[in-house]
């Protein structure tokens, strides 16, 4: 009988659901995190670069970057009780400064993981130790696998529009235009659909393709329900940083088309069709059934 690792976790919903079937998880709420930690007595404290937390208690002014004394109390309890502490920055290099320099969070942990190998040397220099490692996004194959569903032709995108990331937006506009000009359909599951969040509303040219939203607990229906999925990346020049949806789509047996980034070529090679602003067509539109 395999005994699951008991992990006290502060993470956003996507990561929490990814590890929930792997670990015995206690998701720490900001309001009573210390009491939860003591009562649960975990084998591991795992905290990621969190923006909301699975329950929303770590959002806005209460983000972990503003909760240094509380995070320090958690790590001190773990140190006193020989419980290893791990921090994962899942958004390197974009938010390296936010979590490691401004908030000084990473210095509190025994081990630091990063999604970008090019940041490892920076962490080691900053922290003055060698316990820094690469941890990429991963797919939980209990959730993401090729399902026996009738796949819709065309493309799906499940995610957000970020007004501030101009290069990503230009890539999406170009990719979207290529798809539409080919006669194929695009269905967009907008993570912020009807939330009216400033800077998160898709421009007018995308509105005809928006079909609503799916909670992350149901996103596998989209990833397994289409011939092809669209992935978009913010980081263009990193060796290993990519959007989580790429690996979840691949695990679902779905063809992936993405904006061109260094990491997509380094890690996935020909598995993913990468399209740059210089391309005038999409090279592959679906997986062969035998590849799923």
Enumerate the predicted regions with their spans:
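Secondary-structure boundary/capping micro-motif
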Residues: 43-44, 60
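A charged, aromatic-enriched C-terminal amphipathic alpha-helix characteristic of glycosyltransferases
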Residues: 287-292
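Short beta-strand/loop segments at the ligand-binding rim of alpha/beta enzyme cores
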Residues: 4, 78-89
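A conserved, positively charged/aromatic
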Residues: 100-110, 223
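Nucleotide-sugar donor-binding catalytic core of glycosyltransferases
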Residues: 1-40, 49-58, 66-70, 111-270
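Nucleotide-sugar donor phosphate/pyrophosphate-binding loop at the beta->alpha transition
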Residues: 90-103, 138-141
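Catalytic-core regions built around general acid/base machinery
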Residues: 68-81, 104-105, 178
């Amino acid at each position: 009988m395999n005994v699951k690792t008991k992990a006290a976790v502060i993470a956003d919903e996507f990561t929490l659901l990814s590890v929930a079937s792997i670990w015995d998880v206690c998701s720490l709420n900001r309001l009573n995190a210390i009491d939860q930690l003591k009562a649960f007595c975990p084998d591991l404290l795992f905290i990621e670069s969190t923006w909301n937390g699975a329950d929303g208690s770590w959002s806005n002014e209460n983000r972990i970057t503003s909760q240094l004394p509380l995070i320090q109390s958690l790590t001190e309890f773990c140190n006193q009780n020989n419980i290893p502490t791990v921090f994962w920055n899942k958004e390197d290099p974009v938010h390296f400064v936010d979590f490691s320099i401004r908030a000084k969070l990473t210095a509190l942990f025994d081990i630091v993981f990063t999604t970008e190998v090019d940041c490892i040397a920076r962490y080691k220099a900053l922290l003055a130790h060698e316990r820094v490692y690469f941890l990429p996004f991963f797919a939980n194959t209990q959730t993401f696998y090729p399902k026996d569903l009738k796949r819709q032709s065309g493309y799906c995108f499940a995610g957000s529009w970020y007004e501030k990331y101009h290069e990503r937006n230009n890539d999406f506009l170009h990719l979207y235009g290529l798809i539409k000009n080919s006669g194929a359909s695009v269905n967009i599951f907008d993570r912020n659909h009807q939330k009216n969040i400033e800077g998160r509303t898709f421009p007018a040219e995308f509105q005809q393709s928006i079909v609503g939203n799916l909670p992350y607990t149901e996103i596998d229906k989209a990833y397994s329900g289409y011939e092809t999925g669209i992935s978009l990346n913010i980081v263009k020049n990193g060796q290993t940083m990519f959007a989580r949806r790429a690996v979840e789509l691949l695990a679902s047996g779905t063809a992936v088309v993405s904006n061109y980034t260094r990491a997509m070529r380094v890690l996935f090679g020909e598995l993913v069709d990468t399209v740059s602003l210089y391309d005038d067509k999409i090279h592959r539109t679906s997986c062969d059934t035998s590849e799923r």
